[in-house]
């Protein structure tokens, strides 16, 4: 039998059928999963192609670090003057002011005043700072001398300090050990 060709003639069918589809979330998710399954593996011909990360790394290695610097370069080199120890060292007044305003030292002194025991490291820190403050006050003349009172209490020590070496040697020779028995 011979084939009969269908002809399209207007009015043959009543009205064109319009189909509307509502895509639910599940349909969209299933399509994404299906697309991912189809695209497993690497791209075709990617065996010899370099990745972008590798290309960027190689370009970074080839780049000359001298090119593109915006930092101004001095043509004449000026020698830097080194500060001497005396210039770097604080004056006694400045150091004393810094030690008196030391917040950590003040907190530790308050803890000591309240009767709290400090650890060995903290106690050593406090002792060092207080000794330094006392030394600086002595150098600046702000320290009240308590030594003359001690000399008045023990006059025999004051006499010994005033003697010369010859006097001490003569006293040693004349010393009688029987006095201590």
UniProtKB/Swiss-Prot annotation:
Biased composition (Basic and acidic residues): 22-32, 55-67
GO terms assigned for molecular function: GTPase activator activity
Alphabetic keyword roster: GTPase activation, Ribosome biogenesis
Superkingdom, taxonomy of origin: Bacteria
UniProt function note: A GTPase-activating protein (GAP) that modifies Der/EngA GTPase function. May play a role in ribosome biogenesis.
Subunit-level organization: Interacts with Der.
Protein name: Der GTPase-activating protein YihI
Naturally occurring in which organism (per UniProt): Aliivibrio fischeri (strain ATCC 700601 / ES114) (Vibrio fischeri)
């Amino acid at each position: 039998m011979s084939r009969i060709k269908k002809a399209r003639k207007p009015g043959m069918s009543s009205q064109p059928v319009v189909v509307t589809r509502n895509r639910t979330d599940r349909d969209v998710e299933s399509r994404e999963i299906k697309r991912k399954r189809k695209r497993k593996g690497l791209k075709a011909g990617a065996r010899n192609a370099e990745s972008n990360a590798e290309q960027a790394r190689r370009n970074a290695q080839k780049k000359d670090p001298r090119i593109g610097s915006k930092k101004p370069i001095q043509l004449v080199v000026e020698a830097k003057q080194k500060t001497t120890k005396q210039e770097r060292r604080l004056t006694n007044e400045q150091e004393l002011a810094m030690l008196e305003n030391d917040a950590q030292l003040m907190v530790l002194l308050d803890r000591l005043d309240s009767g709290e025991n400090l650890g060995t490291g903290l106690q050593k820190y406090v002792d060092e700072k207080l000794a330094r403050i006392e030394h600086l006050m002595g150098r600046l003349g702000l320290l009240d001398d308590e030594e003359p009172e001690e000399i008045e209490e023990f006059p025999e020590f004051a006499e010994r300090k005033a003697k010369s070496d010859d006097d001490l040697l003569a006293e040693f020779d004349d010393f009688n050990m029987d006095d201590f028995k």
